[in-house]
Amino acid sequence: MTAPGARLRIIAIGRDSKGPEADLVARYAARLQPRPEVVALPDGTGSPAEIKRREADAILRRLAAEDLVIALDLGGKAPDSAAFAAMLASWRETSRPLAFVIGGAEGLERRIIERADAVLSLGNLTLPHLLARAVLAEQLYRAQCILAGHPYHRAGRP
C-alpha cells in the first residue's frame, strides 16, 4: 500500500471495541500491505473545547515530523474511490509514513487540521467513530485493489 518499509497508521480517538466494527477493521487491515497499525487513543474529558484540546495533544504526541498526515473531517474533500486511490498512489510515492487521523465526537481541533497534509471527508453522513474506522479501512483496501487492477472494485456498475 505504501512504499516498501513505509508505515501506515490509523490514529483514532475512542476505545478499541470488540464489536462488529472492530471485526471489519481487522478484516480489511489484514488484507492491506503493509498491514496498518491501528492506534486507539482515549476520549478527552471536560468541556467541548477542552476535549478537543486534550485529544489533539494525544494525536500530536503520536505523529512524527516526517508523517504525511491525512485528517478525516467533515470539512474535507469527499473523493470517490478512484480519486482516493489516485491520492493514495501519490502519497505512497513520497515514501513518507502515512497517518490517517480520526477525531472524537467533538471533531478535530484546528491544530490537527493545520498539521494535516490533506483533509478528507467520508461524506456528509454522520458516522459513529468506530464505523468511520471500518469505512476507512475498507476504502484503503479498495484503493489498493484499484491500484493493483484487482476486480474487487467494479467501477461503473449499474
UniProtKB/Swiss-Prot annotation:
A cellular component annotation (GO) from this entry: cytoplasm
Main location: cytoplasm
UniProt KW Methyltransferase keyword: yes
Pfam families: SPOUT_MTase (PF02590)
GO molecular function: rRNA (pseudouridine-N3-)-methyltransferase activity
Tree of life domain: Bacteria
Binding site for S-adenosyl-L-methionine: 72, 103, 122-127
EC id: 2.1.1.177
Family annotation (InterPro entries): Alpha/beta_knot_MTases, RlmH-like, tRNA_m1G_MTases_N
Keyword S-adenosyl-L-methionine set for record: yes
Enzyme type, top EC level: transferase
Compartment annotation: Cytoplasm
Reaction(s) this enzyme catalyzes, per UniProt: pseudouridine(1915) in 23S rRNA + S-adenosyl-L-methionine = N(3)-methylpseudouridine(1915) in 23S rRNA + S-adenosyl-L-homocysteine + H(+)
Keyword annotations of the record: Cytoplasm, Methyltransferase, rRNA processing, S-adenosyl-L-methionine, Transferase
Similarity comment text for this entry: Belongs to the RNA methyltransferase RlmH family.
Record note on quaternary structure: Homodimer.
Known role: Specifically methylates the pseudouridine at position 1915 (m3Psi1915) in 23S rRNA.
Protein name per UniProt: Ribosomal RNA large subunit methyltransferase H
Organism: Acidiphilium cryptum (strain JF-5)
Gene: rlmH
